[in-house]
From Swiss-Prot:
Protein's cellular compartments: Cytoplasm
Keywords from the named record: ATP-binding, Cell cycle, Cell division, Cell shape, Cell wall biogenesis/degradation, Cytoplasm, Ligase, Nucleotide-binding, Peptidoglycan synthesis
Keyword set includes Aminoacyl-tRNA synthetase: no
GO terms classed as biological process: cell division; cell wall organization; peptidoglycan biosynthetic process; regulation of cell shape
GO MF annotation list: ATP binding; UDP-N-acetylmuramate-L-alanine ligase activity
EC numbers: 6.3.2.8
Species whose genome carries this gene: Baumannia cicadellinicola subsp. Homalodisca coagulata
Residues forming coiled coils: none
Reaction catalyzed: UDP-N-acetyl-alpha-D-muramate + L-alanine + ATP = UDP-N-acetyl-alpha-D-muramoyl-L-alanine + ADP + phosphate + H(+)
Name the UniProt record assigns to this protein: UDP-N-acetylmuramate--L-alanine ligase
Pfam families, alphabetized: Mur_ligase, Mur_ligase_C, Mur_ligase_M
Described purpose of this protein according to its UniProt entry: Cell wall formation.
Main location: cytoplasm
Length: 490
């Protein structure tokens, strides 16, 4: 540990050092746990509560965090400040107790903003791609020896963490637009990857409200700050005339300041040329498939180039980039002989994408990189509201796979909506396309159903943001077969 740098951090805001114990309600979530871990390493006493034990809570307990697995008023008695997840109800007994005791209650984003306030903040926002872009940018800064603090929404495989405390001056963070909480942040540099209708329940169902919120976010930049924005995105192009900050664009668009061309993909390996204004052209090589990941990489390159990071560090970091957990995550290759007695091998991949645009990008990536494979998708829709709002879009995109198995909608805390369910979605796809989806209501039937239909050279894509991640892991460790040969992760 860099004790000298830690001492410097502790002197930045002496008033905050008066805070001894910080309590997190819902500490088991990825976003909450990352910030808790950073504050723990900064020297604060951290406690938390959650209803479920998981890998995250076990890791925090091993680091010395005190976690109670029930929400009771006693948990907050000695806290100086309480940090709450957006998933926590205001009726939570710990919140009620904190209010009675006049203990300050803040959101996760407010605490992240406090961490960013005395660092060089770089915030990555957008409907799609922000987690991967954050990880790519963090990897470049690590390669360059800049030792950044990192707060991400996905596990970065190369460091095995969602978040880390660095002793350099940079804080690289994923900015969450889902509940407008990113408006608390005041970064020096911002990336906006794209803007699309999602989480509309938090925007009163008004897309203009969503657009204007992103406009407010970009104007959180100081006058000397920089906004990095994707010119391929039509909503971003529409917003550009209304922005009064320094903007640098990127994309396949011929007018972009950082322009991709000559894109090639073979399996997971991607290469392309990158033209940069007043800078040498770069040949980029990635092991993250898809045009969407090429765009994510260019967003990171644009920031790194503007910040003066050497090209060799950029190229090396991106080539070595191992990806994000649950983002086109190759879990292994499996012999069919032990699954259904047939000859051949199938490949199992997990992907977190749950918006139809994300599904479309992943399907396109498979078609380009593995053109000879039959694409078998197991999809778990995420949220009733998203399924309702994007129903026709889902129908069109899901119709493009070769075989579709669909699980029940993962509610993510939502109540069911009449007429919005996976069985109806399957019926609509069946009636409007050549595809005959298979609806699976009972999860224990999934391995049997897969075994019946799998063929040599299939690519099985476990798609979704809910419990399907656990299902994919179970399949990979032996529920689908007992003797597994793992390939290196992509």
């Amino acid at each position: 540990m860099n004790y000298q740098r830690l001492a410097q951090l502790q002197k930045l805001v002496p008033q905050m050092r008066q805070v001894k114990r910080i309590h997190f309600i819902g500490i088991g979530g990825v976003g909450m746990s990352g910030i808790a871990k950073i504050l723990l390493h900064e020297g604060y006493q951290i406690s938390g509560s959650d209803l479920v034990q998981n890998k995250v809570t076990k890791h925090l307990v091993a680091l010395g965090v005190s976690i109670k697995f029930q929400h009771i008023p006693e948990n907050v008695l000695d806290a100086n400040v309480v940090v709450v997840s957006s998933a926590i109800s205001i009726a939570n007994p710990e919140i009620v107790a904190a209010k009675k005791l006049r203990i300050p209650i803040i959101t996760r984003a407010e605490m992240l903003a406090e961490l960013m306030r005395f660092r060089y903040g770089i915030a990555i926002a957008g409907t799609h791609g922000k987690t991967t872009t954050t990880a790519m940018l963090a990897s470049i800064y690590l390669e360059a020896g800049l030792d950044p603090t990192i707060v991400n929404g996905g596990l970065i495989k190369s460091i095995g963490q969602y978040a880390r405390l660095g002793y350099g001056s940079y804080l690289i963070a994923e900015a969450d637009e889902s509940d407008l909480s990113f408006l608390h942040l005041q970064p020096i540099v911002t990336i906006i990857t794209n803007i699309e209708a999602d989480h509309m329940e938090n925007y009163q169902g008004d897309f203009n409200y969503l657009k204007n919120t992103f406009l407010k976010f970009i104007h959180k930049l100081p006058f000397y700050g920089k906004g990095i924005m994707c010119l391929d995105d039509p909503v971003i192009r529409d917003l550009l005339p209304h922005i009064s900050r320094h903007i640098i664009t990127y994309g396949f668009n011929s007018k972009a300041n950082f322009r991709l061309t000559n894109y090639h993909q073979k399996e997971a390996h991607v290469s392309f040329q990158l033209y940069r204004q007043d800078k040498p052209t770069l040949r980029i090589e990635l092991n993250s498939p898809g045009r969407h990941n090429a765009l994510n990489a260019v967003a990171a390159i644009a920031v790194a180039t503007e910040e003066g990071i050497a090209d060799k560090n950029i190229l090396q970091a991106l080539f070595r980039f191992k990806g994000i957990n649950r983002r086109f995550d190759k879990l292994g290759c499996f012999s069919l002989k032990k699954i259904n007695g047939k000859n051949g091998v199938v490949m199992l991949v997990e992907d977190y994408g749950h918006h139809p645009t994300e599904l479309q990008a992943t399907i396109q990536s498979v078609r380009i990189g593995w053109p000879d494979k039959r694409l078998v998708m197991v999809f778990q829709p995420h949220r009733y509201t998203r399924t309702r709002d994007l129903y026709e879009y889902f129908v069109g995109v899901l119709s493009k796979v070769d075989v579709l198995l669909m699980l029940d909608i993962y509610p993510a805390g939502e109540n069911p909506i009449a007429g919005i369910d996976s069985k109806s979605l399957c019926c609509t796809i069946r009636n409007t396309s050549k595809l005959d989806p298979i609806f699976i209501h009972e999860l224990n039937k999934l391995p049997v159903m897969l075994a019946q239909l799998l063929q040599d050279n299939d690519l099985v894509l476990m798609q979704g943001a809910g419990s399907i991640g656990l299902i994919a892991s179970q399949l990979a460790i032996g529920k689908l077969q007992t003797n597994i040969r793992h390939n290196p992760l992509i």
